[in-house]
Amino acid sequence: SVILKPASLTPASAIALTEIIAKQDLPTGLFNLIIGSGSGIGKLIATSPEIPAITFTGSVEVGKSLYADASPHLKKMQMEMGSKNPLLVLDDADLPTAINCAANGAYGGTGQKCTASSRIIVQEGIYKKFVEGLTDHISKIKVGHALEEGSQMGPASNQSQFESNLNYIEIGKREAKLAYGGNPMNMRTPGF
């Protein structure tokens, strides 16, 4: 059987998945959803003799803690932590495709997914055109409430994530040339 424990601040998609699975002709208890604090529930899962394996996606800090709790019990573990996914754009790349992939990879899901493109490595021969095209593309992204019609990018999931985003922007300003934005937006809707 499977126990799904989503991030405590963003359980909606896990609830929707559970509702879909519940409508299937599956044995009771095959799929289980637990919502709550990761520190409490994670430790219970990690130390339970009834749970032989864990798959974890999240931060390095939380992953280390989970591993420390689970390893004495010789559990099988699969961990994907602190992703920093690069996107490589070569000189012979199809420019519109590369720009679209970069924008979707970096900004899709407000960049809050483990598969987000955290860095883009661009060869010198295509660099200028790529930056110009990407800047134009992202300037057209409609930022708004996540459920607002036409909104393409919603808010950060919490204040801590928002502050982390701002910190990365400041690092970028110090270590590179800013091409677009760089300041928090003044939005009329709640969120971060």
Where are these regions (language model features)?
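Beta-loop-alpha module in the N-terminal Rossmann-like domain of NAD(P)-dependent dehydrogenases
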Residues: 38-44, 58-65
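Short beta->alpha connector loops at strand-helix junctions that form conserved
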Residues: 5-7, 35, 90-91
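A structured beta-alpha segment of the ubiquitous adenosine-cofactor-binding alpha/beta core
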Residues: 33-52
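Conserved small-residue-rich beta-alpha loop and adjacent elements
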Residues: 1-28, 52, 96
